[in-house]
From Swiss-Prot:
Belongs to the ABC transporter superfamily. Lipoprotein translocase (TC 3.A.1.125) family. Signal peptide: none annotated. InterPro entries: AAA+_ATPase, ABC_transporter-like_ATP-bd, ABC_transporter-like_CS, ABC_transpr_LolD-like, LolD_lipo_ATP-bd, MacB-like_ATP-bd, P-loop_NTPase. The gene is lolD. Pfam families: ABC_tran. Gene3D superfamilies: P-loop containing nucleotide triphosphate hydrolases (3.40.50.300). It comes from Coxiella burnetii (strain RSA 493 / Nine Mile phase I). This is Lipoprotein-releasing system ATP-binding protein LolD. Residues 7-233 form the ABC transporter domain.
Length: 233
């Protein structure tokens, strides 16, 4: 069994520069994600949590340091290669679902598979349907985005993130726009899928109950990640 980290970074730093103004956000962060591990990133608003996720996903460039995703040094990749790496190895879930309103749930989940290529549309639909079933929405596959509730939209977004079978899902406040009951349901579903699919999750959240169910809770403060809690499962 391969126990190599699915994401690993060394001395990761990020400073935003505007003219003479320098805003340090991250300073020499060391971080690794094991296969199947679930990690919560917590911290005050503006601490740099979303920036950290963007760096891990190759959506922003670090000022210093290195990041490996499934063994690939993303600093050495072109933008096109980063896009291919994201499609193959990473899934993304955001506070806002970012579903395309002109398509139904099934079509939205199909999109990452069709972008990747090498799969017939029929088989992409079959796989997308299977993942909608995993998130409890097999009965809503043909419904357009506007016909879905907030919780259902986020479930579709979760299925879309998982359908390519990534090594890790990066989630930024995935329950932030939901009421408490729906947030609990989406959080529990996320944990269930983490266990059943053995896909790692790195989740930025202000939801303390959700964070406390993770394997590790890391606090981002003053540019550094500090361990708050760790569990042995």
């Amino acid at each position: 069994m391969n126990n190599a980290p699915v994401i690993h970074c060394e001395k990761l730093s990020k400073t935003y520069v505007e003219g003479k103004l320098r805003v340090p956000v991250l300073h020499e962060v060391e971080f690794s994600v094991a296969p199947g591990e679930r990690i919560a990133i917590v911290g005050a608003s503006g601490a740099g949590k979303s920036t950290f996720l963007q760096l891990l996903g190759g959506l922003d460039k670090p000022s210093n340091g290195k990041i490996w995703v499934n063994g690939n040094d993303i600093n050495q990749l072109s933008e096109r290669e980063k896009g291919l790496l994201r499609n193959q190895h990473l899934g993304f879930v955001y506070q806002f679902h970012h579903l395309l309103p002109e398509f139904n749930a099934l079509e939205n989940v199909c999109i990452p598979l069709l972008v990747r290529g090498g799969i017939k549309p029929k088989h992409a639909r079959q796989k997308a349907s299977a993942y909608l079933e995993k998130v409890g929405l097999s009965h809503r596959q043909k419904h357009r985005v506007g016909e879905l509730s907030g919780g259902e939209k986020q479930r579709v977004a979760l299925a879309r993130a998982l359908v390519t079978e990534p090594c890790c899902v990066l989630a930024d406040e995935p329950t932030g726009n939901l009421d408490q009951k729906t947030a609990e349901q989406v959080a529990d579903l996320t944990l269930q899928l983490n266990r059943s699919l053995n896909i790692s999750f790195v989740i930025v959240t202000h939801n303390r109950e959700f964070a406390d169910k993770m394997d590790r809770v890391l606090l981002l403060d003053k540019g550094q990640l500090q361990s708050e809690s760790e569990r042995n499962h």
